[in-house]
């Protein structure tokens, strides 16, 4: 699993939106727009991105790609700063699952939880939380896949 040190070793080019948007085999995601929530005026969005683990990778490439899935091209110049400000705080599987549950609480159709069966957990990182932004960004690594959970609100 990657950490802040792995990220810091990347060049600015390797952290760029153009590089991050590149190929990430098996990546798939589901997005819950504001109308999926009980209170659509809250303008919340959830995006859950997954990909099978690739041999020889530590998840960093997946995380960068997952962060730019819904990134707007006109904001490309802000991407490096955004990913560079991530906290890379190690969290437990219980904390990961609790944070997902808290952000998904107001979905009209309940989110199947936990996002991964409770086996094969390797580690998780809190990248952004409500402590600093109106964003929650989490990364989890399991023996068979990577998961990125993203929640934000514009209100």
State where each predicted segment sits.
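N-terminal "domain-start" segment
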Residues: 1-99
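Intrinsically disordered, low-complexity segments enriched in Gly and acidic/Ser/Thr residues
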Residues: 92-112
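Acidic, proline/glycine-rich low-complexity IDRs
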Residues: 105-155
